[in-house]
A protein has these predicted regions:
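Short edge beta-strands and adjacent turn/loop segments
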Residues: 1, 41-65
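N-terminal, polar/charged subdomain of small-to-medium soluble alpha/beta proteins
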Residues: 1-5, 9-12, 16-26, 32-33, ...
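Short aromatic/hydrophobic contact patches that present stacked aromatics
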Residues: 5, 63-65, 104
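Short alpha-helical functional segments enriched in proximate histidine and acidic residues
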Residues: 28, 32-33, 87, 91
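A short amphipathic beta-strand at an alpha->beta junction
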Residues: 40-41, 93-112
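Mid-chain, well-packed structural core segment of small domains
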Residues: 54-95
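Mobile acidic interaction elements
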Residues: 78, 82, 108-112, 126
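Short, low-complexity, polybasic intrinsically disordered segments
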Residues: 114-126
Length: 126
């Protein structure tokens, strides 16, 4: 953990530069010092079927979720959320200037015992 997941409408695939966004997000998460680098993952789910608002325009959206393990303070979660949303808005600013685009972001804290993981990548970062 953490996992950064972007749900994106297909009509912005060419312009969204999600590899660039993921690079920035992973760097920012590592820089906080509160997440183990070996657990950071970013991925996209492209949506080929959606409807927004009245459906009359070529609207687009990106909804992003950061899933994190339990145990971090509200203050640290708030700081991470604000920093990431600033980064997200900056990344998508050029696209937002040229089309209708909705951005949303949430942090989801997983249950402390009802999630299960195995990862040997952590050893590379110790």
């Amino acid at each position: 953990m953490p996992h950064f997941i972007a749900e994106c409408t297909e009509n912005i695939r060419e312009q969204a530069d999600l590899p660039g966004l993921f690079s920035k997000v992973n760097e920012a998460l590592t820089a906080t010092g509160i997440f183990p680098p070996g657990g950071i993952r970013s991925r996209a789910h492209w949506l080929d079927t959606w409807r927004m608002a009245d459906g009359k325009r070529d609207y687009a959206f990106v909804h992003m979720t950061l899933k994190i393990g339990a145990g971090r303070s509200l203050e640290s979660r708030q700081a991470v959320g604000e920093a990431l949303f600033t980064l997200i808005k900056t990344h998508f600013a050029p696209l937002m200037e040229n089309r209708y685009l909705a951005l949303s972001f949430e942090i989801e804290e997983l249950h402390p015992t009802l999630n299960f993981k195995q990862n040997n990548v952590h050893a590379l970062f110790k």
